[in-house]
Amino acid sequence: PDFGHVLIMDEKSFIIQPNPDAPGLSVSVDGVDATGAAVNLPVVTEKPVTLFLNKQEIVTSMTLGDWVAELAVGYFLNQNMLALDDEIIGIDHDEELGVVIVRTAHETNFEAKMKRKIRTSGCAEGTAYGDMMERFDDIKLDLSVKFHASWLVSLSKAINTAPSLYLSAGAIHGCVLCHQHRPLVSREDIGRHNAVDKIAGWMFLNKTPPQDKIFYTTGRLTTEMVIKTVQMQIPVLVSRSGFTAEAVDLARRAGLTLIGRAKGKRFIALSGIDRIVFDSGDDDEFADAPSMQRARLSLIHISEPTRRIT
């Protein structure tokens, strides 16, 4: 199915952007509004997909049902069940059974790992495993990479105005892989953890280097979002939503630039501030605010010691 459009237009275009009209992603449902008037509403679908790594069943996830190969690969990567140097020799998808099997060149056995299952705060009941943090402190994010505040305006406009299932039906989260001011690949799902995994899978399958990328999400900045972004080795995480304190602690521990409440030229950064180049300027949006207030609108820096999470 044509779940997304591949675009080769100009430097501001997506490489791949959502196709909200793809078959099977939503259905039309009749109902009434608050006045009793008849309405017909597009509603997103939910499908169970069971992921296998070689011969072992790992998890069943409720998902939108698109890009399931990317979803499976990204999930296994973010759960430390696949390594970046692992060789995938095949991916099988049985749409009727709702099964995806990822086959690797070497044998795998995660029976012990699966006993340490943790339910996350992600929509659609995300699942993590107790040793998900085992590689976290070993990952070194590139400190030389800069994030220009001016890029955020272009990114936000391109992302928020692009066709998407969120705009047509709602009840969905989106994640976008970006480079500087340009959005590259967009993925959506009913759970933000699924959307993240789809991006991780796409990067692995397309051998995309992460060091100079930006990760944009519509969801909350939680520990799961921070952990997965760090494991993907992307140095900047941006959201139009807010933070949890534990996510901020983890971002600082990893040296991740964490930016939330992003809207237009306004944002709040709580970690990795040294990467930010404040080049957006003082335009009409901030013209009526004193200089110190303008600085606060764009940046909040918490100087209190952070807590360690183990």
Which stretches of residues belong to each language-model region?
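Intrinsically disordered, low-complexity regions enriched in acidic/Ser/Thr/Pro/Gln residues
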Residues: 10-174, 178-179, 184-186
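A short acidic/small-residue loop/turn micro-motif
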Residues: 66, 191-192
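Feature captures the catalytic cores and cofactor-binding loops of soluble hydro-lyases/lyases
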Residues: 192-281
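Single conserved hydrophobic/aromatic residue that forms the stacking wall/gate
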Residues: 300-310
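C-terminal domain-closing interface element
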Residues: 271-299
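Histidine-centered active-site/metal-ligand motif
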Residues: 173, 193, 301
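Short, Lys/Arg-enriched N-terminal segments with co-localized hydrophobic residues
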Residues: 1-8
